[in-house]
Amino acid sequence: MGGPAAARTGAGGLRALLLALVAAGVPAGAYNLDAQRPVRFQGPSGSFFGYAVLEHFHDNTRWVLVGAPKADSKYSTSVKSPGAVFKCRVHTNPDRRCTELDMARGRTRGAPCGKTCRGDRDDEWMGVSLARQPRADGRVLACAHRWKNIYYEADHILPHGFCYLIPSNLQAKGKVLIPCYEEYKKKYGEEHGSCQAGIAGFFTEELVVMGAPGSFYWAGTLKVLNLTDNTYFKLNDEAIMNRRYTYLGYAVTAGHFSHPSITDVVGGAPQDEGIGKVYIFRADRRSGTLIKIFQASGKKMGSYFGSSLCAVDLNMDGLSDLLVGAPMFSEIRDEGQVTVYLNQGHGALEEQLTLTGDAAYNAHFGESIANLGDIDDDGFPDVAVGAPKEEDFAGAVYIYHGDANGIVPKYSMKLSGRRLNPTLRMFGQSISGGIDMDGNGYPDVTIGAFLSDSVVLLRARPVITVDVSIFLPGSINITAPQCHDGQQPVNCLNVTVCFRFHGKNVPGEIGLNYNLTADVAQKEKGQLPRVYFVLFGETAGQVSERLQLSHMDEVCHHYVAHVKRRVQDVISPIVFEAAYSLDEHVMGEEDRELPDLTPVLRWKKGQRISQKNQTVFERNCQSEDCAADLQLRGKLLLSSVDEKTPHLALGAVKNISLNISISNLGDDAYDANVSFNVSRELFFINMWQKEEMGISCELLESDFLKCSVGFPFMRSKSKYEFSVIFDTSHLSGEEEILSFIVTAQSGNLERSEALHDNTLTLTVPLVHEVDTSITGIVSPTSFVYGESVDASNFIQLDDQECHFQPVNITLQVYNMGPSTLPGSSVSISFPSRLSPGGAEMFQVQDMVVSQEKGNCSLQRNPTPCIIPQEQENIFHTIFAFFSKSGRKVLDCEKPGSFCLTLHCNLSALPKEESRTINLYMLLNTEILKKDSSSVIQFMARAKVKVEPALRVVEIANGNPEETLVVFEALHNLEPRGYVVGWIIAISLLVGILIFLLLAVLLWKMGFFRRRYKEIIEAEKNRKENEDGWDWVQKNQ
């Protein structure tokens, strides 16, 4: 909450600040405790002045009583720092002086106090606790828990503790209480020897309750004195008394827990089982004992649950409720908390909630808790919770308000010690309230800050309750305009807002600023208001005015609000809100010492300080509940695609239409609309209707389209048809199905049995429709090998004897579209052996995809250089030469072929783009040389495949997805050198053999035995006869 700095803002700035704070729902500065004019009392330095504080009155005089447990006493100068109680007059004390109370006590060490009692007041801490009897002449209890009985000091010094009952007038001698003293008891730890009574004290009308945490070896106990018969109630519960070191009595209080007419006492034991406990006891007058009726436990070790207590009837049901502090409760470090227990009757308490303030680091929230009475005049008591170590020991105090449900969880006010005065330290260690200290009819609050030896009195400001009424017509008829905005007829309504205020002891008049806002519910939702005011010729959704009000007088202002044309939402009510804040307060005559305080507006439990009222649009309904019955039908249409197509091909379809039909079978449907939840990758193009039917669409989000149907309402038994068109060109295809969730709704109630046809889901599968192809080339397409081929034409690997022929194959995969190909694989197979048992011919060096948009798996030959070894002889060689065959074709599709297959996976391939794969290989020619073929033809086959799981569909009858790449190895036919020599030699030998064979044959046939001599002589005779005439006759 704001502090003094905010309260000192100038008049203009204060008005703006108040309006802003009204809008935020929190009061300016503090709520109704005046932090601008604190009344501060200062005590002796280093005295812990303010360790305990108490508001007190006697007759018409108001006092602030202050404990200073480390002060020196002017009445006991020989005693070392016994502590003191100071009284500070509130009125007629302009210098804020405080004087020490004279308790007329012994001034020397060892003063007698009983048969076996001698008192030692050194460092007794008088004023460690203060309490007041709750009546007009109530006495005051002041205690010094470190007071010691030194009668047996040779054996033990007994810190019994000491309390003093001071009369109401603070003048006469009071009554000494040493509740733990028992004659002839001298043991230190046992029973009450070290009880330290008075560390905490509480006063009821009849009982004095004093905590004694040191009794029974620090199990602790309560000392409860009945003032009526001057007897003590005893605690005889062995289960409690035997729990050593629990410190029962560290904090005490009392209230009406079991019955409105019965007083019960409460004791805190912050060390009980390490978590702390709180016990409620009934003071049984018959037995004179304390009987346990309730107990509660802390939640965390070391939280010191029960070290502060406050009994207060928060909900005013006649039974006390209980607040328990745990100042060392830690989430990080000692933030502290307070647990609130509500009384369920008969002493049974139930935890309602826990308070944490601001949960500040090391704040020790809950170190002190005080009942303040009803400081804001709302009929319920309020409480203050101290956090003295907050803000590095500056301290803070939080104010909480009771109500019919118990306590308001949010504090109404936070008082920062640092903001009140930068010198304050441990502000909030002690708090006292419940008494009207300045006479304005409201209880005030006094807070101690003992490390700065200070006490601050904060006065409560009068609280004003403003009654606001907003008068509106019961309904608005939007079918018959009653007003004009310029020349245009419009619907309108009369708005009247009235104010009056009341409050206790509010002097003078008040100025009130207010803002009247039209259709505030729409504004809170970030939507434009449906109604507006016309001010000075301009439209406005809000009117701001200032009023001067006198007590209980009502003032009203009248306005006309116009309804906007073509209002879509005619079902939700129109809410008007009047938010208000105080302006100026006309003061009466001021007292110079304690001036009258300006009033504040009543806090509304953290809500906006405003008033609302609403009206509705008039509706024509036949049924009592005005229930509509919307019925939705729809169909998907893909552009330029056959209706029978079962899917949407990405890239092929440019837009998609949803044909919608909506019918109303019930009463008139107000604010009827059809909404479309669609993919964020779709873009809304347009809405189409055959004829104007009052349908309009608005894209509220990238994936949410809302279409209003009918204006101002969709009539009963009517039917509307329209289409909405979306652009599908940006669909990525990440989703398998494109879904449209269509919902029809209206502002009317619609019966549950009629909702089944209000929602429609339209879907269409998304696929990638592609036409892929693959082509390939090889380099070189052919090459020559053989013994006579120069070795420089080939490649030799390091330390290898083999000669290799480089072979490079380039494949290109192309996507004709229309969709992007999300992924594909390419396989290439080629023969790798001449025969099933032969050696591997190829060494794959690399296989890469262009632009690194894919990856390939390689199978490298571990023994790329193999030279086949065969048992040859000259005759085999010559035979091979003369028996060479023609062409050998190696093809993986032939049976018995041994092939090498390589694979590549390609990334997404957009429409009309290609991807290149380069395969680099080496062919071992040494293996080819062993083959007798003159030409070896290699058939490499490559194929592209799409993955069905990626929802890819190939276009039927499209481009081929397979290609054939052919390259040839040509064997050089020249024989080897030694073979040529052998051929010549063998040829000569064969020729001679043939000649000899012919000669023998001729000889056998007698060719060489002819009668050449007779033939010659016959020929000679023939010639001679030709020369004569009778050669013929002679011959005959």
Curated annotation (Swiss-Prot):
Name the encoding gene, please: Itga9
Q: Secretion signal: which residues?
A: 1-28
Superkingdom, taxonomy of origin: Eukaryota
Places the protein is found: Membrane
Question: Which parts of the sequence bind Ca(2+) 3?
Answer: 436, 438, 440, 444
- The species this protein was found in: Mus musculus (Mouse)
| Motif GFFKR motif: chain residues | 1006-1010
Give the tissue specificity. Expressed in the media layer of the arterial wall (at protein level). Expressed in the airway epithelium, skeletal muscle, basal keratincytes, the basal epithelium of the cornea, hepatocytes, giant cells in the spleen and smooth muscle of the stomach, duodenum and veins (at protein level).
Glycosylated sites:
226, 494, 515, 808
Membrane topology, from the record: Single-pass type I membrane protein
What is the name attached to this protein's record?
Integrin alpha-9
Give residue spans on the Extracellular membrane side.
29-981
Against InterPro entries, the record matches this protein to: FG-GAP, Int_alpha_beta-p, Integrin_alpha, Integrin_alpha_C_CS, Integrin_alpha_Ig-like_1, Integrin_alpha_Ig-like_2, Integrin_alpha_Ig-like_3, Integrin_alpha_N
Disulphide bond pairs: 88-98, 143-163, 180-195, 483-492, 498-556, 621-626, 697-707, 856-892, 899-904
Family as reported in the entry's similarity comment:
Belongs to the integrin alpha chain family.
FG-GAP repeat copies, ranges: 36-97, 109-175, 183-233, 234-290, 291-350, 352-409, 412-475
